[in-house]
């Protein structure tokens, strides 16, 4: 083998090594892009499922409200009442496993979680204290689907003496 042939083979070998490195880098990029694509598709799928669940659960909230109203009207100890209570608890348990949580009503009114349906003037408790829950509220994975409807304490309005001005007959 001549010196020229060796040089040509060495050059060809170097070119092939370079081409191999380029292809190897290209393959790594493709693999990374594919992994990112798979993760994106999986994330979108989870988001789609979450949104579908949120939609369905939001449609079931009025059913939970109806169960609560029925239980508030029923007589404890009655077999029918106990059956309705059992079904309500099962439904609520299933929905809670999917991410639904009842909004727990604390002492203070929170406009992000509560809807004031009545203002009760009183000095017995601190202003904006929740006096009564009219309807339960619900969250789904931290997002408020339905605010709790509550009665809120407010300070009594001071009755101010108002001066009533008589209309004047002057025309300018």
From Swiss-Prot:
Q: Where in the cell is it found?
A: Cytoplasm
Q: Name one GO molecular function term.
A: adenyl-nucleotide exchange factor activity
What domain of life is recorded for the organism?
Bacteria
InterPro entries in the cross-refs? GrpE, GrpE_coiled_coil, GrpE_head
Q: Which family does it belong to?
A: Belongs to the GrpE family.
* Subunit and interaction comment: Homodimer.
**What function is annotated for this protein?**
Participates actively in the response to hyperosmotic and heat shock by preventing the aggregation of stress-denatured proteins, in association with DnaK and GrpE. It is the nucleotide exchange factor for DnaK and may function as a thermosensor. Unfolded proteins bind initially to DnaJ; upon interaction with the DnaJ-bound protein, DnaK hydrolyzes its bound ATP, resulting in the formation of a stable complex. GrpE releases ADP from DnaK; ATP binding to DnaK triggers the release of the substrate protein, thus completing the reaction cycle.
Name of the protein: Protein GrpE
- Species source reads Thermotoga maritima (strain ATCC 43589 / DSM 3109 / JCM 10099 / NBRC 100826 / MSB8)
